[in-house]
Every structure is written in C-alpha cells, then in structure tokens.
C-alpha cells in the first residue's frame, strides 16, 4: 500500500497528465485481434496472449521446441487496448454502433433537448471550460416505434449487437486446437442453459425471454455490445463517481479508462458532487462499456439535497437528461414501498442503500407511496424511447450480516418481480439488484428467490459480503460471496474496493476491486462449466509446469504484479528461465522433481525405475527430506 499522499491539486494534475498522454496500450506480450462476423461487417475486439514454445528435446546447442498456441481472452478495454488507434479524450471514441442504429430507421434526431435542466446547462457560459466539446445531437424513437433490444428480439430480429455478442461470448475458443488446453471439468450449473457454442440466435432467444439484457442506449453509440445474463459469462461492474468532498472530471475519466483496462464490463457513474452533468458527458463520450447511473442522486442535488422536496417532475426531467446523454441503464428504487419501511425498524443497521434511504425518507415525510412506484409506467415509456435498461434497485438490502434475508429484503424483491412484468409490457430490458451482507450459508436462497419471483431476469449483486469484520479488506470478504452467487446463477457482480465503508476509491483501489471480482467471476464460470472457461487455467498450469516464467506473468490477470513479486527475490534475467522459484529453491521444487521422475520413467521400464528409486530411498535412510549435500 502506497503511503504517498498527494494534494488535491497534485491529484488533478496527475489525472490530467494521464489523459493528455493516453495511448492505446496492449498488455505484455499480448496483441489486439479482431474476430470478424459473417454479417453486418462486425469486428469483435479480443486480446491474444502470445506464448513462448516448450522445450521438448535436443541438446543445449540444438534444442527442439514445440509451439504453444496463443490464448484469446475477452477484452473490455475498447480502443484503449489497441496500440494502433489514436486516442483523443477531447474528441471521444469512434461511434461504433451509429450505422447500426441509423440503419434500423426507427429513430429521429431531436431539434432540442427534452430536459429543461440540460437546456439550462448548455446556455450557461460559465460552464464552457468544463463542457465536452463534441456533444452529440440526441436521438429518440420515432412515434409509434420501440427501439429496445428486447423489442427486436421478441420480433425475431437478430441485431448486429446480438451477432457481435455471440462472437464475443465464445472468446475465440474455436481457435484452440490443443486437447490439453480444451480439457474442462464438468460444472454444476444449477439449471442454467450453457450451450457449447453461442450463436446470434441463442443471444436473441435469451434476450426475448428476459433472461438476459443488452444495455445499449441509442445515444451511446461508442459502446461495444455486451450481454448480462445467467447463461453467459459472469460480468463485473465497477463504480466510479465524484462526491461533494473529492474528485474531479479528469480523475473520473482516468478511473473510467483504468476500469475498462482492468476488466470492467460496465461502469456506474455514482457522482453526487458538482458538475454531475458535465462529468457524465465526458465519461459517456469516452466509454467503450455501458454506463449506469442512479438518477435519484442527481435529482436530489437539484433540490439542494432535501429528500422531502423531491418531485416526480424533477425526477422525470433527470431521466430525460440522462437518457439523451446516453446512459445505458438506470438504477430505480421503485420497490421501496411505504408499508415496507417499518419492517426495517428492528434491523441492526437499518436502511443502508443511499437510494433506498432517500425514498424511505420521502415516503415517511409525505406519508405517500413511493413516487417511483406510482409513476413506474411513465418511467418505462421513457426507457423504451431510448433503450435504457432498468436495474431495479434493492433499496432495502441488508447492510449487516445480522440483517440478511429478512422480511423487508424479500418483500422488496417480490415487488421488483411485479415491476419486472410491467417493464416487459413496454419491451424494456430489466435486471434485478441484490445484496449486500449475507453469510455464506444464506447466499443461495437469494438466488433461488430471485429466479422464482423475478421470472429469471438477470441478477446483479453487490458482493455479497460474507463477514463484517474486515474494513480495508472488504474486496476479499465480498469476493467470496460474489464467487458463490455467481456460481449459483448471478449474472453480474458489482465490485467492492478496499475502501468500502471507509472512503471514495482512488485509481489503485479500482484496480484492486476489479482484479478481485474478475477472479470471483472466473471462478464462477469454471464452477458452472461455462464452455471454454478453463482454457486460460490450463495454459497457465502448462506454463507453470514447464517453468515458462514469462508466459506465467503474461497469462495472469495482473501481469505487472506477478512479475514484480517474482522479481523481488529473483530479479535477474536468469531467474526467468530457472526451473525453480524462491519459494522452494532448486532442490525442493515439486514440479522439477515431477519432471525428473517423468523423464526417468520414460527412459526405463516403470518396474525397473520404481525398484531403483525404492533402493535409493532406503539407502538414504528412508527420509522424505534430506540435507542439501545428501540430496
């Protein structure tokens, strides 16, 4: 952990330098490849990890090698992972999806912004220095049309987005020929449907059934299509955002780029401080992944932070503002009903969701039903016009182990299931948010309740944290629960950083949270038996057994840390070819011994070899461990 503390001015200057000097960068010994589709001129970006050959025979002067296949992996970094693409944050990313959106001929360009707040911001000359210069002219559905991926799927249309996703989810595994790499243990998928090959039609079918969503606002054409669903790879979300206390636009853009580099499948902008509108514009125009928000946070800012002063009109204006900027999914706490609030009175930690507490306070102060619930159909109409997915928020999630799986939590969950059916009437895509703080033995019930009462809509959970005793390490406590619930069927995991419960995460915290959650998601994919999930593990194990250190570093989720820790004790280049590491040394390396036994057995008959080894073992006193000079 770094002990260097920068001033606010230094932090902003450092972030600005990062943005100004940003270039497309590949991971060590990796290259960007594009897998093409058979339709729509689709090119799906992936990262291909190049591996060194294996020494199989020969002499020191004339060694014989066998090539190792390159390993393709899922890549969320967008243009930032391609050294051949010029990056300019001031201009934003290329509009990948714009031709697809326009070809459907069901959208119209707006002559003016629908949000009064947006119009006010655009005419404020005092904001010129902060404003993104290449603003898009927003689009919305033509009258009588619906532009959601769910609408297309239900009408039997395979969109370019669906075709893109099918290629992406297969992760290039069709390229792998080695039986060693293709070997995979059977999984336990708890009823999930995991086809051997993901086709565009399968993607369409899952979206049409509501079991998966494609967050893809028509006003965020820069995003690369991805899917969230139980029958696909487990995804990870990263939260960023400023607060009234700290952070700036440049720091949040830096965190966005950093998050996509380290594997964020989506990013939520949870900004609550100044310049929320301007910060979000910079993030959207430079994001290759879907962006989510919690609109009630900004609506609260518009009424000076006084929850009682919130109105449907202010909230509706915020939805229009964000939808026309390009937000891909909204977290809406419409399930926090007035009658559920008293259920939380006996909790140890009450209501811990910011959105949930805001709506609970509004309900109690007015003694009226939650206006998000009352106006839910109007919310759906707005979402359908821009293809904004709904993430139905768990405002009553447990904030402590003691409060897990209580009546308030599940009452809200059942209401979210009812709201899901309403959203589907409007062809609006839906996922369900989940806890929270749940001990391990109580986690699976959360998944089974969600599948039953929310009609198999994708589940999206914050962890859950499996213990409350580790502030500073809650990425660990929650990573355990995340791996478990991902295995049980959760579609997306919201990361937790080391700063959870302690402060706003910085760039390094974002990385630590993401690495932890990529481990959890991958472990869940392995346990489910997702086709091809074990290829990278097999490649790593083979490299480890063959002492190909460079390949071990490069196959790691974090190559830089793997290399740095190896080099702490074996920094010289000779350490990169040594047949041991500093853990055991040359005499006690189990893999080196295994190789020697294997070579010995290959040179002689098994019976003779075992007899000789047995005789040698007895001659040396029958001891498992020997002093170095005896060995």
From Swiss-Prot:
<feature type="binding site">
    <location>
        <position position="437"/>
    </location>
    <ligand>
        <name>Zn(2+)</name>
    </ligand>
</feature>
<feature type="binding site">
    <location>
        <position position="589"/>
    </location>
    <ligand>
        <name>[4Fe-4S] cluster</name>
    </ligand>
</feature>
<dbReference type="GO" id="GO:0009228">
    <property type="term" value="P:thiamine biosynthetic process"/>
</dbReference>
<keyword id="KW-0784">Thiamine biosynthesis</keyword>
<keyword id="KW-0456">Lyase</keyword>
<comment type="function">
    <text>Catalyzes the synthesis of the hydroxymethylpyrimidine phosphate (HMP-P) moiety of thiamine from aminoimidazole ribotide (AIR) in a radical S-adenosyl-L-methionine (SAM)-dependent reaction.</text>
</comment>
<feature type="binding site">
    <location>
        <position position="239"/>
    </location>
    <ligand>
        <name>substrate</name>
    </ligand>
</feature>
<dbReference type="GO" id="GO:0016830">
    <property type="term" value="F:carbon-carbon lyase activity"/>
</dbReference>
<dbReference type="InterPro" id="IPR037509">
    <property type="entry name" value="ThiC"/>
</dbReference>
<protein>
    <recommendedName>
        <fullName>Phosphomethylpyrimidine synthase</fullName>
        <ecNumber>4.1.99.17</ecNumber>
    </recommendedName>
</protein>
<dbReference type="InterPro" id="IPR038521">
    <property type="entry name" value="ThiC/Bza_core_dom"/>
</dbReference>
<dbReference type="InterPro" id="IPR025747">
    <property type="entry name" value="ThiC-associated_dom"/>
</dbReference>
<feature type="binding site">
    <location>
        <position position="501"/>
    </location>
    <ligand>
        <name>Zn(2+)</name>
    </ligand>
</feature>
<keyword id="KW-0862">Zinc</keyword>
<dbReference type="GO" id="GO:0051539">
    <property type="term" value="F:4 iron, 4 sulfur cluster binding"/>
</dbReference>
<dbReference type="GO" id="GO:0009229">
    <property type="term" value="P:thiamine diphosphate biosynthetic process"/>
</dbReference>
<comment type="pathway">
    <text>Cofactor biosynthesis; thiamine diphosphate biosynthesis.</text>
</comment>
<keyword id="KW-0949">S-adenosyl-L-methionine</keyword>
<dbReference type="GO" id="GO:0008270">
    <property type="term" value="F:zinc ion binding"/>
</dbReference>
<keyword id="KW-0004">4Fe-4S</keyword>
<keyword id="KW-0479">Metal-binding</keyword>
<feature type="binding site">
    <location>
        <position position="460"/>
    </location>
    <ligand>
        <name>substrate</name>
    </ligand>
</feature>
<keyword id="KW-0411">Iron-sulfur</keyword>
<dbReference type="Pfam" id="PF01964">
    <property type="entry name" value="ThiC_Rad_SAM"/>
</dbReference>
<comment type="similarity">
    <text>Belongs to the ThiC family.</text>
</comment>
<feature type="binding site">
    <location>
        <position position="333"/>
    </location>
    <ligand>
        <name>substrate</name>
    </ligand>
</feature>
<feature type="binding site">
    <location>
        <position position="581"/>
    </location>
    <ligand>
        <name>[4Fe-4S] cluster</name>
    </ligand>
</feature>
<dbReference type="Pfam" id="PF13667">
    <property type="entry name" value="ThiC-associated"/>
</dbReference>
<feature type="binding site">
    <location>
        <begin position="353"/>
        <end position="355"/>
    </location>
    <ligand>
        <name>substrate</name>
    </ligand>
</feature>
<feature type="binding site">
    <location>
        <position position="297"/>
    </location>
    <ligand>
        <name>substrate</name>
    </ligand>
</feature>
<dbReference type="GO" id="GO:0005829">
    <property type="term" value="C:cytosol"/>
</dbReference>
<feature type="binding site">
    <location>
        <position position="433"/>
    </location>
    <ligand>
        <name>substrate</name>
    </ligand>
</feature>
<feature type="binding site">
    <location>
        <begin position="394"/>
        <end position="397"/>
    </location>
    <ligand>
        <name>substrate</name>
    </ligand>
</feature>
<keyword id="KW-0408">Iron</keyword>
<feature type="binding site">
    <location>
        <position position="268"/>
    </location>
    <ligand>
        <name>substrate</name>
    </ligand>
</feature>
<feature type="binding site">
    <location>
        <position position="584"/>
    </location>
    <ligand>
        <name>[4Fe-4S] cluster</name>
    </ligand>
</feature>
<comment type="subunit">
    <text>Homodimer.</text>
</comment>
<dbReference type="InterPro" id="IPR002817">
    <property type="entry name" value="ThiC/BzaA/B"/>
</dbReference>
